[in-house]
Amino acid sequence: MPLLDSFTVDHTRMQAPAVRIAKTMKTPKGDVITVFDLRFCVPNKEILSERGIHTLEHLYAGFMRDHLNGDSVEIIDISPMGCRTGFYMSLIGTPAEADVAQAWLASMNDVLKVAEQAQIPELNEYQCGTFDMHSLDQAQSIARSIIAAGITVNKNDELKLSDEILNGL
């Protein structure tokens, strides 16, 4: 099985909250797709609560589009990581990490403005596969912790696992 890009970086050295360009690629038509690692938690030290990450999934995807989409950027998808330490965001374009961090902070402030659970988008059995597994309180607690900590940048060249380590795993 091929080694995926996300497993070639040293998770023991990742900082969080942090933005990382996980991958860039070009489509056959020449559009650039950028995949961002939006790391909310330090891997193997912290984890996002199940209800909190699910509620953030519903809120964060829309708020990030509000703050980042424009003439040169269009978000394709924002999805939670299986390890529950953050989200992957795929988009058309090449926004700077600082712009992504600004949009992320603005989105966290938007999460804090949601007044009640009923305002969570797509919170019903028709549009959500586990519509009763949500917590606005937990999502807002996560947002507050991101705002308080601030967002940094993880660089691939600083996190790259050596061939020696990869071959020994």
Swiss-Prot record:
Co-factor(s): Fe cation
GO biological process, one term: quorum sensing
Protein's UniProt keywords contain Iron: yes
EC number: 4.4.1.21
Catalytic activity line of the entry: S-(5-deoxy-D-ribos-5-yl)-L-homocysteine = (S)-4,5-dihydroxypentane-2,3-dione + L-homocysteine
Database matches in Pfam families: LuxS
Cofactor binding description: Binds 1 Fe cation per subunit.
Superkingdom of source: Bacteria
UniProt KW keywords: Autoinducer synthesis, Iron, Lyase, Metal-binding, Quorum sensing
InterPro entries reported in the protein's UniProt record: LuxS_sf, Metalloenz_LuxS/M16, S-ribosylhomocysteinase
GO terms, molecular function: iron ion binding; S-ribosylhomocysteine lyase activity
Binding site for Fe cation: 54, 58, 128
Signal sequence bounds: none
Function: Involved in the synthesis of autoinducer 2 (AI-2) which is secreted by bacteria and is used to communicate both the cell density and the metabolic potential of the environment. The regulation of gene expression in response to changes in cell density is called quorum sensing. Catalyzes the transformation of S-ribosylhomocysteine (RHC) to homocysteine (HC) and 4,5-dihydroxy-2,3-pentadione (DPD).
Homology family: Belongs to the LuxS family.
HAMAP family: LuxS
Quaternary structure, from the entry: Homodimer.
Protein's name according to its UniProt entry: S-ribosylhomocysteine lyase
Record organism: Shewanella sediminis (strain HAW-EB3)
Organismal lineage: Bacteria, Pseudomonadati, Pseudomonadota, Gammaproteobacteria, Alteromonadales
Name of encoding gene: luxS
